[in-house]
Amino acid sequence: MCHPTVATAERAGLPQAPQCMLCHEGIKRQSPVIRRLAAHSKENKPLPWVRLYRVPDFVFFSHASHLSAKTACASCHGAVERRDVLAQEAPTNMKFCMDCHRRQGASLACNLCHELGQ
């Protein structure tokens, strides 16, 4: 997995260059972006991540529950392994999520994603 805490924490967590290089040592290694990544790893410098996906403060999203439901990362993040530069592949809005829940037969209960003042 690319993200260190995706299965265990509220947030997926952002990897650092050495973790990225575990795969990228042999994948797209001639790409200028991956070369910069390798340099960060070699120099043990933190990566200047730019967050691509955000949900509103009133929405709770659990990567862990989606992983346990066997939802593929690519369902929202696309074919990351084929990208030189990452971009937001899917919207982080209610319509996108509800459409996916309907396709997968997942619950549509409001309290899965929203705190209802209980």
Task: Indicate where each model-derived feature is located.
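Short sequence/structural segments immediately N-terminal
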Residues: 1-118
